[in-house]
Swiss-Prot record:
A lipid is attached at G116 (Phosphatidylethanolamine amidated glycine). The keyword Transport applies. CDD domains: Ubl_ATG8. Ubiquitin-like modifier involved in autophagosome formation. With ATG4, mediates the delivery of the autophagosomes to the vacuole via the microtubule cytoskeleton. Required for selective autophagic degradation of the nucleus (nucleophagy) as well as for mitophagy which contributes to regulate mitochondrial quantity and quality by eliminating the mitochondria to a basal level to fulfill cellular energy requirements and preventing excess ROS production. Participates also in membrane fusion events that take place in the early secretory pathway. Keywords: Autophagy, Cytoplasmic vesicle, Lipoprotein, Membrane, Protein transport, Transport, Ubl conjugation pathway, Vacuole. Interacts with ATG4. Interacts with ATG30 and ATG32. This is Autophagy-related protein 8. Gene3D superfamilies: Phosphatidylinositol 3-kinase Catalytic Subunit, Chain A, domain 1 (3.10.20.90).
């Protein structure tokens, strides 16, 4: 899926900004968070985040939930490179494994599991 942030900012500018952020804030990760295009969930009010390295994916999801003001009973899923990362994973580990060549970590969020079933989870009737 194409990133709106990438469309609006040239590669060299994004790369320079990510490098500047990593140099100035060594304990933080530059993250771009955007809504999956066809999701019915609200748009987040800002898409650029400086995330502490020791934050978990679950804690980051909580931050996004608060920013888009959705009720706790509504599901939210985040995707990085079309995968659903484990909620206990540290953002620093996810960043090292999935950062873009421009230095940002691109996160998509949706109100539904857009990319299909979660492996290993079976439905019961």
């Amino acid at each position: 899926m194409r990133s709106q942030f990438k469309d609006e900012h040239p590669f060299e500018k994004r790369k320079a900004e990510a490098m500047r952020i990593r140099y100035k804030f060594a304990d933080r990760i530059p993250v771009i968070c955007e809504k999956v295009e066809k999701s019915d969930i609200p748009e987040v009010d800002k898409r650029k985040y400086l995330v502490p390295c020791d934050l978990t994916v679950g804690q980051f999801v909580y931050v996004i939930r608060k920013r888009i003001k959705i009720p706790s009973e509504k599901a939210i899923f985040i995707f990085i490179d079309d995968i659903l990362p484990p909620t206990a994973a540290l953002m620093s580990k996810v960043y090292e494994e999935h950062k873009d060549e421009d230095g940002f970590l691109y996160v998509l969020y949706s109100g539904e599991n857009t990319f299909g079933d979660i492996p290993g989870v079976e439905e019961i009737e």
